Amino acid sequence: MFLNGQGGQRPPMVAFPPLNVRGSISSGFNALGRSRNNSDAMDIYTITDRGPAAERDPAAGRWHANGSPSINSTSSKNPDRYPCYQENGRTYHGYRKGIYMLPCDEQEQDRLDIFHKLFTVARVSDGLIYAPHPTNGRFLDLGCGTGIWAIDVANKYPEAFVVGVDLAPIQPPNHPRNCDFYAPFDFESLWALGEDSWDLIHMQMGSGSVASWPNLYRRIYSHLRPGAWFEQVEIDFEPRCDDRSLEGLAIRQWYQLLKQATEETMRPVAHNSRETIRNLQEAGFTEIDHQMVGLPLNPWHEDEHERRVARWYNLAISESIETMSLAPFSRVFGWPIERIKQIAADVKSEAFNKEIHTYNILHIYQARKPLAN
């Protein structure tokens, strides 16, 4: 399902019929340092074309691209000062404790990598970047998670310099020499990353982790070179169905509760495309392009590509419902873990019901910082 958005045309992007893939992915990662070498059920390396580096280049972290200073020249924080903590049977990072609603353990890292794979499959023409970009530029990934996007880009463009920043230090040590990570890093705080110095800034799945999008967009704008681009990828998790009402269904109730809980914590998970475009414009961006891709939760298409995309989304959403609910529902509503697990099970049952043609929408934005006069 390709939904035309604002801006130029893209090749049709289809993301559809989720097959009932309910198994979890387990791998040989520890909680905060994934080796990415072994897997009990599925090798996480099969999610992308990248492979592990044979060994870490000793120059990594000091490599200069385009004459720019290394990311490690900025002030760094010791992750050991912010120990992880357990909540509802999951592990959460201690930096800015309580602000971010998602865990950082092995299960969560696998979930993030699954979504990355979903995006690369759904984005037909180029799974990593739509926005114009040099092959030897400086790329910044905000909220990089496991670093999988940054590593893929660094491998694709060996002359580029790619930096990922995140609250949690969960990135692998065996990344390419032209890629580096800075964590813990709060992109809502002041940056020491060089204004007017980045050729592309990328962000995906930021909804639920940002208190002020206008402030963030202004900061992104100030750090891009004139003429450079920002690209953002988000999922609107509001359930939609074109052939029946979702009133009274658990999946609709779940989303409304999640929306309410995250709004009360000042970091709403709800995504509004009109508001996003307006905020980008007010920050100074021009040439804003917006694409939308339907992500159905049921297998009602015959096309093989659509079925492939759907398999990944089915797996991604099945791994997400409980994970996204745990902290918001327990912290905001005071729900016990048993009640959270029950509503998650009810939602999964409906999401996998082939008689209910529910879908979400994937939004992809590109926005340009104008050239200097």
Swiss-Prot record:
<feature type="region of interest" description="Disordered">
    <location>
        <begin position="55"/>
        <end position="81"/>
    </location>
</feature>
<dbReference type="InterPro" id="IPR029063">
    <property type="entry name" value="SAM-dependent_MTases_sf"/>
</dbReference>
<dbReference type="GO" id="GO:0043455">
    <property type="term" value="P:regulation of secondary metabolic process"/>
</dbReference>
<dbReference type="GO" id="GO:0032259">
    <property type="term" value="P:methylation"/>
</dbReference>
<keyword id="KW-0808">Transferase</keyword>
<keyword id="KW-0749">Sporulation</keyword>
<dbReference type="GO" id="GO:0005634">
    <property type="term" value="C:nucleus"/>
</dbReference>
<dbReference type="GO" id="GO:0052067">
    <property type="term" value="P:symbiont-mediated perturbation of host phagocytosis"/>
</dbReference>
<dbReference type="Pfam" id="PF13489">
    <property type="entry name" value="Methyltransf_23"/>
</dbReference>
<keyword id="KW-0843">Virulence</keyword>
<dbReference type="GO" id="GO:1900691">
    <property type="term" value="P:positive regulation of gliotoxin biosynthetic process"/>
</dbReference>
<dbReference type="GO" id="GO:0030435">
    <property type="term" value="P:sporulation resulting in formation of a cellular spore"/>
</dbReference>
<protein>
    <recommendedName>
        <fullName>Secondary metabolism regulator laeA</fullName>
        <ecNumber>2.1.1.-</ecNumber>
    </recommendedName>
</protein>
<feature type="compositionally biased region" description="Polar residues">
    <location>
        <begin position="67"/>
        <end position="77"/>
    </location>
</feature>
<dbReference type="GO" id="GO:0008168">
    <property type="term" value="F:methyltransferase activity"/>
</dbReference>
<comment type="similarity">
    <text>Belongs to the methyltransferase superfamily. LaeA methyltransferase family.</text>
</comment>
<comment type="function">
    <text>Methyltransferase that performs automethylation. No other methyl-accepting substrate has been identified yet. Component of the velvet transcription factor complex that acts as a global regulator for secondary metabolite gene expression. Positively controls expression of 20% to 40% of major classes of secondary metabolite biosynthesis genes such as nonribosomal peptide synthetases, polyketide synthases, and P450 monooxygenases. Controls the expression of the gliotoxin gene cluster.</text>
</comment>
<keyword id="KW-0489">Methyltransferase</keyword>
<keyword id="KW-0804">Transcription</keyword>
<dbReference type="GO" id="GO:0044550">
    <property type="term" value="P:secondary metabolite biosynthetic process"/>
</dbReference>
<keyword id="KW-0949">S-adenosyl-L-methionine</keyword>
<comment type="subunit">
    <text>Component of the heterotrimeric velvet complex composed of laeA, veA and velB; VeA acting as a bridging protein between laeA and velB.</text>
</comment>
<dbReference type="GO" id="GO:1900376">
    <property type="term" value="P:regulation of secondary metabolite biosynthetic process"/>
</dbReference>
<keyword id="KW-0805">Transcription regulation</keyword>
<keyword id="KW-0539">Nucleus</keyword>
